[in-house]
């Protein structure tokens, strides 16, 4: 899309037609949040004479490369908020409204802007993730080159008139598959030239391990590098953040331009491994009374707690406190993976869960009735502990 599209036109393209319904999707409770309406009036005027979904799609198609409604539908389903699903237009409209409402709160100074340096929002790229992305880049290059060679031989090779495509591959396979793009790419990457494209080039990914001592080698293996130029005159990313307590060593950082950019993991910190959010969503649907967004009413949206998994609004739930305590018990007993992050944002009434990889996690003690687990009478009598007990 070559230009910005007015908010209400995007909402109508997603199937939310009336102005009142669009404002309900944004504010949820119009009576309670009536003071926000004045700030949405310019959006109503920006929509002009576009009052139907068809007109909205016709308007958007003028700013696209394809110039067709089917091309616009492809963008809305595959590229607009892709984490919400492909054809879930109502869910995408609700999520767009949720984002606009959050932006209005920040604009009116009712909430602070998102702290981009908070480790809640940071993800660590481990060697496995870096290798996967590198392989994907060179695999796509190799695939493109093979297809190009096949096309040249099929359409332009003199003397080839066979309609059977398999015969072409069998007779020319040595030449078609001669280039070893993936192998050569990995060789270049491990010599320091990491990345296949100019915009994916990285410096400092491959380093010689410091083995002066066991401790220095261990520290070097747990080193984190913020992808910023050491000459950048920015202060906030270099400062200590309260969210790094127990995750990042507050002392072990070099002097000079790299101060605060090169960090080291704390001794007990780990990096989470990912698992599918749909496994957790399937578990919630069978064990909790969770309501799907496409079946929810405006009354449900006003009064029920939102459930977010990996940043995607997945549904609504009625009893967040009880659900949170049950989820924590399931997590402690290993019924759901122990590295699942679960929190309840009481102010915004959102139950957040994360299953993605790269999150920094650390062990904590369980406290029941203001007593930590290692002070219980049973363990004192026995005199020994296991990790499961703690």
Briefly describe each language-model feature range:
Residues 220-250:
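Flexible, glycine/threonine-enriched loop-and-boundary segments that flank and lead into catalytic domains
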Residues 253:
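Short, acidic, Ser/Thr-enriched surface-loop or helix-capping motifs
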């Amino acid at each position: 899309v070559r230009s910005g599209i007015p908010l209400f036109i995007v909402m109508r393209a997603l199937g939310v037609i009336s102005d009142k319904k669009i404002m309900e999707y944004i504010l949820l409770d119009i009576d309670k949040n009536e003071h926000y309406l004045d700030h949405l009036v310019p959006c109503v005027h920006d929509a002009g004479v576009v009052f139907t979904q068809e007109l909205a799609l016709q308007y958007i198609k003028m700013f696209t490369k394809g110039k067709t409604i089917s091309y616009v539908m492809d963008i809305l389903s595959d590229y607009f908020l892709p984490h919400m699903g492909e054809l879930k237009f109502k869910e995408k409209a609700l999520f767009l409204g949720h984002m606009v409402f959050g932006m209005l709160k920040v604009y009116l100074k009712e909430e602070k802007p998102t702290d981009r340096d908070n480790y809640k929002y940071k993800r660590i790229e481990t060697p496995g993730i870096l290798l996967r992305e590198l392989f994907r880049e060179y695999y796509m290059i190799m695939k493109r080159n093979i297809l190009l060679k096949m096309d040249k031989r099929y359409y332009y090779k003199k003397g080839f008139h066979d309609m059977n495509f398999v015969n072409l591959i069998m007779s020319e396979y040595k030449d078609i598959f001669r280039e070893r793009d993936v192998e050569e790419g990995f060789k270049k990457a491990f010599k320091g030239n990491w990345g296949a494209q100019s915009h994916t080039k990285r410096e400092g990914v491959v380093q010689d391990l410091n083995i002066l001592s066991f401790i220095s080698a261990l520290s070097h293996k747990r080193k984190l590098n913020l992808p910023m130029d050491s000459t950048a005159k920015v202060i906030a990313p270099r400062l200590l953040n309260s969210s790094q307590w127990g995750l990042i060593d507050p002392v072990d950082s070099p002097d000079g331009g790299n101060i605060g950019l090169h960090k080291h993991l704390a001794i007990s910190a780990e990096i989470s491994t990912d698992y599918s959010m749909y496994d957790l969503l399937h578990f919630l649907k069978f064990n909790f009374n969770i309501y799907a967004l496409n079946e929810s009413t405006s009354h449900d949206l006003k009064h029920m707690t939102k459930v977010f998994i990996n940043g995607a609004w997945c549904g609504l739930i009625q009893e967040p406190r009880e659900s949170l305590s049950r989820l924590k018990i399931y997590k402690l007993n290993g019924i759901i993976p122990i590295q699942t992050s679960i929190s309840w944002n009481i102010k915004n009434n959102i139950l957040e869960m994360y299953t993605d990889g790269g999150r920094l996690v650390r062990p904590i003690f369980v406290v029941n009735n203001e007593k930590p687990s290692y002070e219980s009478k049973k363990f004192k009598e026995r005199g020994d502990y296991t990790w499961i007990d703690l």
